[in-house]
A protein has these predicted regions:
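Long, charged low-complexity intrinsically disordered regions
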Residues: 1-160
Length: 160
């Protein structure tokens, strides 16, 4: 799911097709001076990803809209994680910085282990993955599937 979301987010980001979900109650997120500067320096990345932000006092951002990806997301935590990712890529080339920023957004919005999906959601997830150019790794490089031989499968199900 993370890989599929990443490809969708990346396509919308570079097409400047902002996918924003307005929040009924805006988030007020307190930040350190360093974090405030990171957001200021990268405000275009947040906006292109669908966030609607404005400074709200000395060390606070008001978030009125968020990237419209995933569900059951803690937007405050996601926002802070994206700032943390940007803080580790300060001297990185713009394209790599954007890749890591979008990968973090996809990671935070993706279905996680232990989440329950109904049959339709499971089918849609598999169909979406099959249609990708690179369905075999998440944007961070971790595998999305593990190949197994017939023998390994039979052994797991105690047939051998």
């Amino acid at each position: 799911h993370e890989r599929y979301l990443f490809e969708q987010i990346k396509e919308a980001y570079y097409a400047k097709d902002r996918q924003t979900q307005m929040l009924l109650i805006p988030l007020l997120i307190g930040l350190s001076t360093k974090e405030m500067n990171i957001v200021r320096e990268n405000i275009d990345m947040f906006e292109n990803a669908g966030f609607i932000l404005e400074e709200f006092g000395d060390n606070t951002y008001k978030v009125s809209g968020v990237s419209n990806v995933g569900y059951n997301i803690d937007h405050k935590s996601m926002f802070k994680d994206m700032i943390t990712e940007l803080s580790t890529t300060e001297k990185t080339e713009r394209q790599e910085k954007e890749h890591r920023f979008l990968a973090t957004l996809a990671c935070k919005a993706a279905v996680k282990g232990g989440m329950k999906l109904d049959v339709e959601e499971q089918k849609r997830l598999v169909d979406n993955m099959i249609g990708l150019d690179n369905p075999f790794t998440c944007p961070h490089g971790r595998p999305t599937a593990i190949p197994m031989t017939r023998y390994e499968i039979e052994r797991k199900f105690m047939r051998k």
